[in-house]
UniProtKB/Swiss-Prot annotation:
Residues at the active site: 11, 73, 92
Sorted UniProt keywords: Hydrolase, Protease, Thiol protease
Protein name: Pyroglutamyl-peptidase 1-like protein
Lineage: superkingdom: Eukaryota
A GO MF label: cysteine-type peptidase activity
InterPro entries: Peptidase_C15-like, Peptidase_C15-like_sf
Record-listed E.C. numbers: 3.4.19.-
Amino acid sequence: MDSSAKAIFLEQCGKNRGYRDSDVRGFQPEDGVCLPGGPEVRLSVVNMKEVCRRVAVENVEVAFSRDAGRYICDYTYYLSLPLGTGHAALIHVPPLSHWLSASLLGKALRVIIQEMLEEIGKVQTQSTAA
């Protein structure tokens, strides 16, 4: 994540293509593809936009994103989503700073994760009612 970021980003999806940079050990997906033949986009069942709408933590911006970048985070997210049948989340956090202490970040993450769990509960309730 960009070290100048000033918000926590909740990522809705992982993408299969566009991986151009190598990781710190030199690994780069062949042809820039995470999973040959895989779907272009995989979505989390957690409605991150709704979670963002409901989360409020003192002076911490929480933002919705559909682009985790084409690097290790997005690659890992894309591959993890089917393992939990979509019950996965990627939270990009900014570095600790004068405006974001470890304590405040911890508080924000607790609130965000609680909202995500509530959102998953809604999805499960809707699927059993159908």
